[in-house]
């Protein structure tokens, strides 16, 4: 289980340092304005490893870990990237982009779990992948819906802040 303690620190720390650097190097100088989103996302990733998860159909899952550290984390990371790059597209494209990101990161996570088990670095069950994917997707969808509501309210003048324009 010790490897997961390292992952809970290493992944968010690396992202918190590397992502702003990469964005600034590529001309996205306004990313600093949105960096708090990155930090909140990374904090959620860290915390998610230590939250209890429910039994589902009598099966021990990591549903909460994936909802918070997979879905909510990815959703906030996506909002940080979209806001920093001032990227906007039609809503189906935006939905697809957040779904693609959460799916890609979820796939990488499942492959990492498989590798760690097969390499003897961890002893975890690999039979909850379907719940992991659902939790990741629901978490990201929660953030996306919140982002849409906040964006709508900013356009209507009900929230102060950057409307992304």
Protein language model features and the residues they cover:
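Bulky hydrophobic segments
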Residues: 1-125, 138-165
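Short aromatic-rich membrane-water interface segments that cap or initiate transmembrane helices
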Residues: 125-134
């Amino acid at each position: 289980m010790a490897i997961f303690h390292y992952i809970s620190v290493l992944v968010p720390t690396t992202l918190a340092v590397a992502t702003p650097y990469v964005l600034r190097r590529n001309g996205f100088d306004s990313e600093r304005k949105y960096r708090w989103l990155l930090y909140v996302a990374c904090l959620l990733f860290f915390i998610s490893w230590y939250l209890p998860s429910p039994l589902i159909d009598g099966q021990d899952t990591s549903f909460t870990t994936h909802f918070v550290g997979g879905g909510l984390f990815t959703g906030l990371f996506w909002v940080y990237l979209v806001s920093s790059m001032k990227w906007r597209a039609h809503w189906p494209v935006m939905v697809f982009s957040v779904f693609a990101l959460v799916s890609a990161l979820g796939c990488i996570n499942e492959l990492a779990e498989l590798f760690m088990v097969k390499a003897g670095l961890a002893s975890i069950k690999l039979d909850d992948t379907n719940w992991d994917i659902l939790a990741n997707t629901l978490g990201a969808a929660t953030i996306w819906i919140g982002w849409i509501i906040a964006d709508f309210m900013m356009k209507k003048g009900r929230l102060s802040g950057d409307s992304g324009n």
